[in-house]
Amino acid sequence: EQAIKMITGEDVELNASGRTDAGVHAFGQVANFKTNSQIPIDKFAIAINSRLKKSIVIKKAEEVDERFHSRLNCKRKTYRYVINNSPEGTAIYRNLETHIPQKLDVEAMKKAVKYFEGEHDFKAFKASGTSSKSSVRTIYEAKVYQSGDRIFIELTGNGFLYNMVRIIAGTLVEVGLGKIEAEKIP
């Protein structure tokens, strides 16, 4: 909002399609705001990027219908957790992945993650202080896959509660460590 005000001179209300928990990175985040600015739309992203921290980059700007709202019109969101499952970890990606040196049972995690698919009440997978009226959410796709020493947990759904994905990922790690049986998830 401050960067937009710097280039337009207007106070705007920025609506993002979602919030990110601490330590979570957003790729493909969509946001909208109303402006009377005369800056050409094809120059807007460049102008805003010149005022943002280096950790935030606007990829594209486009005009949308006045009724559009990034969060309310969002159809689905995907979260991906990356686990480095090597004994030593890596320094270069330490802010983008979680290092778990104990060998994880990926097959058990793959079995367990499927129990999260569908419409469920996820009240057991939300942090305290969650203000959502309902804890019912739909997960369209849930998967665990491995590439080398990295294990990926991906959840795509219609919305997520505060810390819900982090708690699900932690539960799947517990399954991978043999502390919880996959069949105990439902």
PLM features: what roles do these ranges have?
Residues 2-186:
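Structured-RNA-binding interfaces characteristic of tRNA pseudouridine synthases
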